Swiss-Prot record:
It comes from Alcelaphine herpesvirus 1 (strain C500). The gene is gL. Belongs to the herpesviridae glycoprotein L family. This is Envelope glycoprotein L. Residues 25-138 are annotated as: Interaction with gH. The heterodimer glycoprotein H-glycoprotein L is required for the fusion of viral and plasma membranes leading to virus entry into the host cell. Acts as a functional inhibitor of gH and maintains gH in an inhibited form. Upon binding to host integrins, gL dissociates from gH leading to activation of the viral fusion glycoproteins gB and gH.
Amino acid sequence: MMWKWVTLLLFVLVCGDNPVNAAAHNPFVCCHQKNETAHTPPKKAWSLVNAILHSPSQCNHTNVALAYFNTTKGYKQVSCVNGFGLMSFCLALFDRLLTINVRVADQKFYDELLGYKRGFAAQFSKATTDSSGFKNNLELDLITTRHGRMASKTHVAGLTRSSASSQL
């Protein structure tokens, strides 16, 4: 199963038209639309055509992303998705490629993702991880308690108090 994701990422990197953008100039569509107007995107990740990750300063440090999906009717559907899930997925793929000695073709993109991760981690709180007020279709409850509520305290393993603000 992992080889399919590695193949997909390699295809995207080789083609040179990266479908996931990490740039500060992207539109803020997901920051302003409420979740009651959301349309459920297609269930298959393979239908993802393009995605825009917002920088930490956008959307009041809440991590939401804009995603474009192909539909069976031949048009593209725009949806807002959980930015933590998408960003973490991309970083995990890059990290996996690096562990098997595959050179990351788009080092600038990888570095921007790491910078965004650090920026979101610096402002990480219960308020900034609650994207329920936005038009957010792919809810991935990454940090929840047993009863489905957001955890009020977090811990990043491997950090000391002095390095917590500069590293992940």
